[in-house]
């Protein structure tokens, strides 16, 4: 049996003048990345640039959706309904699917970000909403979680 380790990293979290991370330096050393979808980081230019960078390094592209929290970088727990979570995920993941497709590739996975990630680890119903929404968008998308 062949063994494989996926080295994964959050990327594309800069937002216009607010620079976050060293994506260009890290990308050659990873096998998959989670690209911010615009709600905690990741403006349109950064998203496109980061997807292109991943593709040129043969790195699998994933969506990194969050609660709508630019000010708190997606780390603040916000009161949201399950329907709101579903809508946020549909919007952000679909955006990454569209851009990735436009650039000639396919979205590989989803890893939710920050507070949403933490909320899902503590609330089974939120976790179920996330899993069902991702499956409804594309049953072939992988869901990345804590190891």
Residue positions per predicted region:
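Hydrophobic faces of well-ordered beta-strands that scaffold small-molecule active sites
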Residues: 5-9, 33-35, 61-65, 108-112, ...
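N-terminal basic/disordered segments at the start of proteins
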Residues: 5-19
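Glycine-rich nucleotide/cofactor/substrate-binding loop typically near the N-terminus or early
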Residues: 11, 53-78
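A short alpha/beta connector and helix-capping loop motif
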Residues: 15-47
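Acidic (Asp/Glu)-rich catalytic clusters
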Residues: 24-28, 49-62, 101-104
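Catalytic beta/alpha-barrel core
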Residues: 35-40, 119-120, 137-147
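Glycine/small-residue-rich loop that forms an oxyanion/phosphate-binding "nest" at active or ligand-binding sites
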Residues: 70-104, 109
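Charged helix-capping and loop-helix junction motifs
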Residues: 123-129
């Amino acid at each position: 049996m062949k063994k494989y380790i996926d080295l994964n990293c959050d990327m594309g979290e800069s937002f216009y003048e607010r620079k976050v991370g060293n994506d260009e330096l890290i990308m050659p050393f990873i096998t998959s990345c989670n690209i911010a979808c615009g709600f905690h980081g990741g403006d349109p230019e950064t998203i496109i640039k980061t997807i292109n960078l991943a593709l040129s390094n043969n790195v699998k592209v994933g969506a990194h959706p969050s609660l709508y929290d630019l000010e708190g970088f997606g780390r603040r727990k916000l009161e949201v309904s399950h329907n709101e979570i579903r809508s946020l995920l549909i919007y952000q993941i679909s955006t990454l699917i569209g851009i990735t497709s436009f650039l000639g590739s396919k979205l590989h996975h989803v890893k939710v970000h920050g507070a949403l990630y933490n909320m899902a680890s503590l609330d089974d119903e939120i976790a179920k909403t996330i899993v069902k929404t991702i499956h409804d968008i594309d049953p072939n998308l992988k869901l990345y979680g804590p190891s």
